[in-house]
Structures are given as C-alpha cells and as structure tokens.
Amino acid sequence: MLGLIVALWATPVTWGAAAATSATFLAISIPLAIIAALMSKMMNIQTSTIPKLKCFDEHVELKLADGTKKTISQIDLGDILEDGATVVSKMRLNADNVQMYNLHGIIVSGTHVVKYQGKWIKMAVHPAATKVPYAKPYIYCLNTTSKRLMINGLTFTDWDEIYEGTLSDILSLEIKNERIGLDIKIEKEENIHKHLETGFSGNTPIELENGKTVCICDVNVGDKLKNGDEVYGLVDVDVLGMNQIYRRRLGDLQYIYGGINLCFGVDPDLTLVITAERYNGNVTKLYHLLTNSGKVCVKNVEFYDYNSGVDLFL
C-alpha cells in the first residue's frame, strides 16, 4: 500500500486516487517518499520478472469497419475495427518461450483471455484450443477503445485484460484535483484511453547497459537497459483522443514530454523536484516499454512501465 500511495502521488492524474488512501499531499508525500525508499532498500522489494504475454501471431487477421482486413502486425494506430472500436495502442513483444495455441485458425498465446459460453477463460484451458510449436521472434497485441478484440466471431480482451470486476473498478474511477483542474469520471471504456493512457515522446532518452543512449522510439525488443532490465515489449500509443500532453521537469532544466498518467517511483537520491505542466506542442505519437522488472529509468528517475497506466488502479 505504501508503494502504491507514493506512485499515485507521483503523477498528476492519480492524485485523486491517492487522496483516498492518504491525508494530504503536503503532509505526507515527502515522509512517505523517504520511508518507501528505505523500505525498498531494506526489503529488496521487486516486481515479478515473469511477464504474462497476451498476444497473437503476426498473421492473425482483424476486420476493419470498412469491411477490409489487416493482419495484426499491419494494423495502424487509429484504425477502426469492425465493432466500431478504435486502435489506440499497439504492442510488439518477444515471443521466446511463449506457448502458443491454435483456436479455429487463430494463433494466440495461452495466457490470453477469450469469452467462451458466456465466461472469460484463459486460452490454455479452452476445450477447442490446441498447443502449437512456435519459432517466430515476435507476437503482437492491441489496446482498443472498446477493450475488446473481435476476431473471426470470437471475443478476446485487449492488452489491458480488464473485464467483469476489474473493468467495473476502472469505469467507476473518479479523479479530482483542483490544483491542475482535473475532474474526471471514467464511466465508459473509451475514456480509459482518454484519461489513463501513458507514454513518452519519441525523443525521450533511454540509457542502455552498453553505455549508449538512444531515443525511446529507437529501443528494440531484447535491449538491456542501464539498470540491467530487459525490454520484452515495445508500445506505440496514439495521442489522438488523449486528454492532454504534459511537460515534466526533472531536476535542473531537464524536461520530458508524455501523457498525464506517467507513473514513477521515488527518485533514487530524493533530490529531484519533479513538476508537470500542460504542453500544447506538436506531439502526435507516444512510446513506452515493457520490461521484466516493470520499470524504466529516464534521466536517473525510475518510472513504471506501460502496464502501470491501468494496473496501479486495480
């Protein structure tokens, strides 16, 4: 709970949620940051290093609203699918050691959730799914405004994998903060992208283990980051439909640009003052990473990876 409170206070969109579990920002944010940093060091708290990939083979076809079809690897941000949902983010992921299944010609990972006889189940336990050998390097997934993927008459969850109880939790979120004029109610699936989407501008610097620094848009699957984490997935995010892009100041005249819901932990030396302001410049696409630790370091500040945008609210 302590780590969650710190993470929620660390980004503007989650201050309302943080208020539900803590008294006031000025009274507790700095003490909590110090305590969280000390506890992390003493207890060696880590997130899971075993990602659960919910993805499809590159040749799985999706029907668009205009009746044409595209393979999932060819889908573009902004494409409108047959159910009227818009594609708002796209993932390409490492397929190493992922068990894939064939369900009526759809090649999909065993951890992906599909609706069967009115219930949501993992692909691995679907009675008609069969294991298949798989040697391709990458698998793919999407997020959509409906939070569903309709493929050949079957209904799958999208990457966020929220349904039933978890979907209700997200749709019931109310986020208010008078300091920056936030008064948000999620209520509808399409508002998840609008208010909770996360990502960095393409020129955000990422330090690699080999000493090189590259823009986040040039990071590759399998790259090792400065802290030793491995990138197992790349995420492209459509800015269209998002609530706002923010500019964040990290320390002395260091700026990064991204969505309102960038979630970060405690600064390692507790010396950086991180501020955020609305940015009206030309940012048309965001990028994020998926790592085996669930974290990404930018300019010596540790952020949570793409999954945090929704997961921190569940």
In which residue ranges do the predicted regions lie?
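Extracytoplasmic/periplasmic, Sec-exported soluble proteins
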Residues: 19, 23, 67-73, 134, ...
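Long beta-strand-rich cores associated with HINT superfamily self-processing modules
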Residues: 57-66, 81-172, 176, 183, ...
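Small-residue-rich hydrophobic membrane-insertion segments
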Residues: 1-45
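Protein maturation boundaries and topogenic segments
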Residues: 29-77, 154, 162-224
